[in-house]
Amino acid sequence: MTAVVLDGVATASAVKSELAVRIRALREQGLVPGLGTLLVGDDPGSRSYVAGKHRDCAEVGIESIRVDLPADATEADVRTAIERLNSDPAVTGYIVQLPLPAGIDENAMLELIDPSKDADGLHPTNLGRLVLGVQGELTSPLPCTPAGIVEMLQRYDVPIAGQHVVVVGRGLTVGRPLGLLLTRKGLDATVTLTHSRTRDIEQEVRRADIVVAAVGAAHLVKPEWVKPGAAVLDVGITRVVDPETGKARLTGDVDPAVAEVAGHLSPNPRGVGPMTRAMLLANVVQAAERDARLAAELRG
């Protein structure tokens, strides 16, 4: 058996094409979606990540609003920048790029974000809505990586309802919100969330119809852990140094040999990562469409 590749690049491209159509419709109404980014410091990885988001925006027709602060910015500087993004009508949604410099309370800064402009879907208010909204349509932004995982599974016709999903990792950006999302009515999965204190994690993974590895441990999930035919999504990334060349490379949580056992497998890179970026755009477009509906209601 050779796994069907869950191609995140191709799937994200399809999502972005659909978003571009919706964005054109918004522009025809005089509404231009805008994504803001707040970057503090000059970390090369963060700069590259933010630049990629703005390239995505240009590709689909979303305006970019970029706020860059120096590495020695104070917490007051960051607070002022967030307040500016909250009040700027050109900003439909925005992100605060992490990590922030030492001495700045990240959680306190993130809580200052207007929940309606939370493009990452990780504001406490929006996570709370995900907890409470077990059925019906959610109008609040969803965490991007969990939403991207669900979107990719659905587009590849991988069954979710009634399936046993094992998530390796309980982080805030993937593990915890993914469990909440997958157990909502309409998706109806049974989810086991594993972590460093889980007993016999291999046995837990072997029971899974869908495995999501999001812990940041290189090649943790081995072929013998995986039930034949299971769908496996490789989310975690670790920077591993090649002892022969001395060069670092990005490595996923899933051993490549899992491809000979799994029914579906997302590569890493080019798997879930592009879907995360696409769902960030989707959150911005959804917020713009919400604003359009509110404007129409006010006009009567």
UniProtKB/Swiss-Prot annotation:
Q: What is its EC number?
A: 1.5.1.5, 3.5.4.9
Keywords from the named record: Amino-acid biosynthesis, Histidine biosynthesis, Hydrolase, Methionine biosynthesis, Multifunctional enzyme, NADP, One-carbon metabolism, Oxidoreductase, Purine biosynthesis
Q: Which residues form the signal peptide?
A: none
Q: What is this protein called?
A: Bifunctional protein FolD
The record's section on Pfam families has: THF_DHG_CYH, THF_DHG_CYH_C
Gene of this entry: folD
Sites where the protein binds NADP(+): 169-171, 196, 237
Q: Which CDD domains match?
A: NAD_bind_m-THF_DH_Cyclohyd (cd01080)
Subunit note: Homodimer.
Member of which family? Belongs to the tetrahydrofolate dehydrogenase/cyclohydrolase family.
Q: Which source organism does the UniProt entry give?
A: Clavibacter sepedonicus (Clavibacter michiganensis subsp. sepedonicus)
Q: Which InterPro entries match?
A: Aminoacid_DH-like_N_sf (IPR046346), NAD(P)-bd_dom_sf (IPR036291), THF_DH/CycHdrlase (IPR000672), THF_DH/CycHdrlase_cat_dom (IPR020630), THF_DH/CycHdrlase_NAD-bd_dom (IPR020631)
So what does this thing catalyse? (6R)-5,10-methylene-5,6,7,8-tetrahydrofolate + NADP(+) = (6R)-5,10-methenyltetrahydrofolate + NADPH; (6R)-5,10-methenyltetrahydrofolate + H2O = (6R)-10-formyltetrahydrofolate + H(+)
The yes or no answer to whether the keyword Amino-acid biosynthesis is present is yes
MF terms per GO, please? methenyltetrahydrofolate cyclohydrolase activity; methylenetetrahydrofolate dehydrogenase (NADP+) activity
An example GO BP is: purine nucleotide biosynthetic process
Q: What does this protein do?
A: Catalyzes the oxidation of 5,10-methylenetetrahydrofolate to 5,10-methenyltetrahydrofolate and then the hydrolysis of 5,10-methenyltetrahydrofolate to 10-formyltetrahydrofolate.
In what pathway does it function? One-carbon metabolism; tetrahydrofolate interconversion
Task: List the record's Gene Ontology CC terms alphabetically.
Answer: cytosol
